[in-house]
Amino acid sequence: MLSRSIGLVIHIDTSMWITVLRKNFLADQHHQRPKGRSGDWKPPLKVAWAIGYHSAYTTQPQGQERVSTYNVAVVGATGLVGQEFLKIAAQRRFPIKGLRLLASHRSVGRKMTVGEWAIEVEEATPRSFQGIDLAIFSATTEVSRELIPAAVKAGAVCIDDSAAWRMEPDVPLVVPEVNAEDLKEHRGIISIPNCPTTPLCQTLWPVHKVNPLKRIVVDTYQSVSGTGAAAVEELTEQTRQVMEGNSAQSHVYPHQIAFNLLPQVDVFLGSGYTKEEWKVINETRKIMHEPELAVSATCVRVPVYVGHSEAVHAEFSKAISPEDFTEMVHEAPGITVQDEPSVNLYPTPWSVAGRDDTYVGRIRQDASVGQTGIAFWLVSDNLRKGAALNAIQIAEELIVRNLM
């Protein structure tokens, strides 16, 4: 599967399910060789070529080229989010000078074709970050806890997709459309929110700024790719087993996921909530700088490959109409409103897979609270806006704000 953009071509050997589910994203992609390079190949970094710079939130002066390029390490490069990061970096022409692909010892020696070079995956160790400007982490909490201090000590700015640092008081937890200003407080580590938290905050923020939230009740419907490649394979295999009349064998989840729903994402805690639900609650409060905001979440795993969906009930301080809510959300960056019930138009995971925006529909007055409540439905690609795209956007903001 080949993803193309001007100046950088990335080839990644991914499984057929991504090819199918990325139909919208890949429909207009074609094979094109790069026109040239900005530098020679110099180990230990595999040198790509300088590529243009794009930021969705900061306007760059017309005709002014950014010449700075950066040595980038991707930890968890062989995982679903790591691979998505590489594709999005190409699409958005992120200014990469050198690229180091890191993973666990199980992936050492695997080659991933980036541009004109087949880059060999190296084992991620504390010594992997010499000469690195930016390190993207998409690994376990344990790996992030172990390696990020070493990366920061080596001089890298780290953007972390795990839960390791999210609730640390001195670590910014950032959705660029919401709280990019928090980046100025970073000390070498920036956290990415959990994948259902990001689109929730992104959608509610433009309304909250003018009509403060009082309460959020959210039910999430989360795809298996949020768990990882093993869960994707399990859904595929269980579907085959059931269709052939056999019993489904579960290894990743506590119950069969094919043709089923599991009202459990992550482990249960003593409160009766799951760890995932508390992530949504606490991360939303931190991102919005509202530590007392009333939030309740129920997180459900669903037999969908890509795309997290959410049914949201939001109560505001003052009366708000569905029309006013729609207008404010529609004007916000990174949000597309799809809301035309008369023609059955609303977002679905299938239609949103491979898209950058968060899609919002089913906007209506919340009948349980009256004029101060809005109910709506949102869908986002959890591998993109829920993870890899958010990381790229944070990195873009760091560059524009001279915070690298």
Q: Predicted regions span which residues?
A:
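Charged docking surfaces used in two-component/phosphorelay signaling
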Residues: 135, 224-404
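Low-acidity, Ser/Thr- and Arg-rich intrinsically disordered low-complexity segments
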Residues: 3-5, 15
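Residue-identity detector for glycine
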Residues: 7, 36-39, 52, 63
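N-terminal Rossmann-like NAD(P) cofactor-binding subdomain of oxidoreductases
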Residues: 63-257, 292-294, 327, 358-359, ...
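Cationic, low-complexity basic patches in intrinsically disordered or flexible, solvent-exposed regions
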Residues: 30-33, 43, 61
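Short, positively charged and aromatic/hydrophobic N-terminal segments
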Residues: 18, 53-57
